[in-house]
Regions:
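Motif-centric detector for short Cys/His coordination patterns
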Residues: 1-85
Length: 85
C-alpha cells in the first residue's frame, strides 16, 4: 500500500543561507547550519551529497556520517519556534 499521499515525507533539500527541507506536502522547514555539530563543520559539497532514507523519513549525509530524521527536525522546530515566540 502506498501511503505517500497521507504521510508527510521529505522530498529534497535546498541549500542557501539555511537548509530547506522540502516536504511532499509542499511545505518547507528551515534548519540552521548549526543544527548538529557535524553539519556545522561540513562544507556545502559534503552536505549536498545526501540521500533520503526510510522512504523520505530521514536524511543520510555519507561524507560526514550523519543521519537526521523528519521527526527530529519537527521536534527541533517545535521547541525552537516556541522559544522564539
Amino acid at each position: 500500500m502506498n501511503t505517500s499521499k497521507t504521510t508527510t515525507l521529505i522530498e529534497k533539500l535546498v541549500f542557501d543561507n539555511k537548509i530547506h527541507v522540502v516536504l511532499n506536502t509542499g511545505d518547507r522547514l528551515t534548519l540552521p547550519y548549526d543544527y548538529t555539530e557535524r553539519i556545522k563543520k561540513a562544507d556545502k559539497a559534503q552536505l549536498q551529497n545526501y540521500r533520503l532514507i526510510g522512504g523520505g523519513r530521514g536524511i543520510h549525509f555519507p561524507d560526514i556520517d550523519e543521519d537526521i530524521s523528519l521527526n527530529g527536525i519537527l521536534r527541533y522546530k517545535t521547541s525552537h519556534d516556541l522559544l522564539a515566540s
